[in-house]
């Protein structure tokens, strides 16, 4: 299906690009989340009329993400979990737990924005975690997992 992107989409294209994607990806994700529209002649003409407005909105989102990124980058957050004597956790710290921790600290972060390269944290200690605030703004934070010996 040919679509026109209404915002930058990672691994796909930038605002205004006309790309071909699988029908299911367009119908189930891109179009419902208002990231794209079908690339009909009418839609392309309407997009060209609204292009400046959409670019302004995209620039505002990027500026807001960069402002939050400057505050968040390099910070350390602590979370306490039950652990054994050997330092392994009973359970794990997931991206949902990290997102909840950041929300309590006053940041508007969703679970999907937290990237954990090594997967869920299963040991006590400091671990690096990435937070994708925007497709162009990814910051690194440190999560210090403190063991609560059972």
Swiss-Prot record:
One of its GO terms (molecular function) is rRNA binding. The keyword Nucleotidyltransferase does not apply. Keywords: Ribonucleoprotein, Ribosomal protein, RNA-binding, rRNA-binding. One of its GO terms (cellular component) is ribosome. Coiled coil: none annotated. It comes from the Bacteria. It holds the Pfam family Ribosomal_L9_C. The keyword rRNA-binding applies. GO terms for biological process: translation. Gene3D superfamilies: Ribosomal protein L9, C-terminal domain, Ribosomal protein L9, N-terminal domain. HAMAP family: Ribosomal_bL9. Binds to the 23S rRNA. Belongs to the bacterial ribosomal protein bL9 family. This is Large ribosomal subunit protein bL9. The lineage of its organism: Bacteria, Pseudomonadati, Pseudomonadota, Betaproteobacteria, Burkholderiales.
